[in-house]
Amino acid sequence: MTHKRHALLSAIMAVAVALSSFSAQADTDILNVSYDPTRELYKDYNAVFASYWKKQTGESLNIKASHGGSGKQARAVIDGLEADVVTLALAYDVDAIAQRGLIAPNWIKRLPDNSAPYTSTIVFLVRKGNPKNIKDWNDLGKPGVEIITPNPKTSGGARWNFLAAWGYALKQPGGNEQKARELVTNIYRNVKVLDSGARGSTTTFVERGLGDVLIAWENEAYLSVKELGPDKFDIVTPSISILAEPSVAVVDKVVDKRGTRKVSTAYLEYLYSPIGQEIAARHYYRPRNKEVAARYANQFAKVKLFTIDQVFGGWEKAQKAYFADGGIFDQIIARK
């Protein structure tokens, strides 16, 4: 009897140890809700970070990703999509989530560079040989030019596009709000398709063959040329463009509920590491790290950049004036 009890106890202990071991090795899942054209970036980054995390902690990590227009993605998180982290196109979309109590109000100061680990800008992708002779923003407003750009109501990239054109007009000799409005009105008069996100617009231009010019994230333009060949497209960098600063944040309410704060924070912090910066640069994002940026300097065209704070007084003011219901974008589209 004693022998049987001992055997049973040994068996129970063995099962307990096995279960404990299984629990220690069980996968942790986190969800990164991101904007449209970061699919390739985060596919590579997620694999590298998961390997790093496994070596550091012994914990297996399963990183899931959701992509779409930045404004649309922010609304999905507000409406209940349980993102552990968000990596969105602009600070305003993260602020919108924070205003609902899901992210701490001071999120922008929790990571370096205002929680924007890489930057980009806005350029033009044109058909090979540039048949419409597109050189700068003013050319986009000329008759006979068909433009593809996403919808600022749903896409973060589209908002950067709109403000880049507006800022260009303001910075011309004699530039003012009226002249900016005239140029941007003429540009949107030429828009053939307003997709919901930047990747959708790339598909419309590249795969469906619509339009003469795609107003695009710089990284998206370079990716298109890389994947489809320099014999099909040219990249035109305007004389002036906007410094686009995609923002990242831990979704506090979700990570505290799921117990994933430590890994989610590390996931975003690793974007600033030399390895994270290298991955960003390989995917045509402009890295913050000066050493990595120097290695990739020849990859990017020289362009004069202005910031949203310098020209528009920040995202809150810009969103209200240009993209809120009844704002300047709505007024321009209504007259199209």
Cite the ranges covered by each PLM segment.
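Short beta-strand->loop
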Residues: 33-35, 126-128, 146-173, 187-191, ...
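A bilobed periplasmic-binding-protein/Venus flytrap-type ligand-binding module shared by bacterial periplasmic
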Residues: 122-130, 245-262, 279-283
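Short helix-loop capping/hinge motifs at secondary-structure junctions, enriched
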Residues: 129-135, 154, 167-175, 254-261
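Ligand-binding pocket segment of bilobal, Venus flytrap-like solute-binding proteins
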Residues: 172-239
